[in-house]
Amino acid sequence: MLVKMAIRNVFRHKRRTFLTVITMAVGLMFYIFFDSLFVGIDRMVVEGLVKYSDSSLVVVSKEYYENQKAYPLKKSIRDEEKIKRLAEGFPDIEGVAPRTQFLGELVYYGKSKYIVGTVISPERDEKVFEIKSSLKEGGFFSESGEDEALIGIDLARELGVQVGETITIMAQTKYETHNALDFVVKGLISTTVPSINEASLFLTYRGAEKLLDLEGSVTSLHIKVRWPKGESIPSYTKRVETIARSLQEKLPEYKVSSFMDIYGDFLLLMQQKKATTYIITFLILLIAAVGIVNTILMSVYERIKEIGVLMAMGFKPKEIRRLFLLEGIVIGIIGGLAGMVLGLVVDVWVIYSGINFAEMYSGMRASDIGMPIWGTLYGEWNIVAFLLSFGFGVLVSFVSTYFPARYASRLQVTECLRFV
């Protein structure tokens, strides 16, 4: 009986109930939207690191690891085949690729920029990284690849370099002597990792031999762990770190790092930045809570005489309190369901259409938007966010209704009946 009365009372004041429900629904919609968006950002960042930057696991010598920011070419890997064989013994490994990174300067007609160069073996690199599929203009390395280079698209735009033109790369060799060599720009790369687009250059081992005197030196081995579509980041991270620990036990003379070991602090910072958005969402829900309090209080004041009649008919204070609490819960359920529906609509849009940052910020570099992402950002489904939003909506309504309901239950019958 009380439930029927509560539902009837909620729909008696349609306009006020509608405004309260809409406020709550919009707040919950923003929560669902931002949750989907930030899970998508997390995935884009991690996928960018895995697909373009360092892959799932990186193996370097301990001497290299201790001075890795200087990219020391002398601290190379001595047991490449052994490490490759051990890595490929795991069922989830899709490929192992050698890389050698160096610091250099790209010079083009009087303009120059410091870059991080990466030396790759094209045929093996394709099994681990997606550099080839990220080509925006031009093509991949030819069979020899000796005098060819790939550079980031934003780097090319900054210096005015076109595909087919010649650039000069200046760098220190393995023996710490200065050298410079000309390369033809074979293609321009556009990835979801801003640092690659803005300051990276790729050479083949054959081409880098003349520039760096590598003599076949490989400073890092990058291992790709299979990542099935739909697997969450925490689940993937757990599998990768399990393999990393196992490899580290078998290779005590080397340092085995997962992508979380390398970028853990950066990813943690991204998590902390989410707090700002969630605070905004909380404020919206707080406004909704104030609206619910207002709705219930107005309902109490408008129905004081009715409350007196109910008490005269034998309703106890706790039943009056329960009636108004039920009204608040009904509003919360309606608002929660409306929020889930609106959240579903925006989720479908952001998951299947995405937000194209490249078009939105055309003419700008990826780093100019202040986020470590580029290209099209897609959201991710998170059923937990829908359930939490609904539960939070009902909880906020219940808490917001408590004090008005308590006030109504404490009214005296004589006071209520005299109220006009």
Which residues fall in each region the model found?
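Mechanotransmission and gating elements of multispan inner-membrane complexes involved in transport
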Residues: 51, 173-277
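Transmembrane alpha-helical interface segments in multi-pass membrane proteins
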Residues: 297, 305-351, 388
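N-terminal Sec/SRP start-transfer signal
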Residues: 1-32, 51, 317-318, 322, ...
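A hydrophobic alpha-helix feature that marks transmembrane segments and, especially
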Residues: 31-36, 274-313, 320-325, 397, ...
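C-terminal membrane-exit region of the final transmembrane helix in multipass inner-membrane proteins
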Residues: 375-420
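Hydrophobic, regular-secondary-structure patches
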Residues: 35-116, 139-145
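Short helix-loop junctions at transmembrane helix boundaries
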Residues: 338-388
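Hydrophobic secondary-structure segments that place a key small or acidic residue at a functional site
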Residues: 99-102, 111-120, 135-207
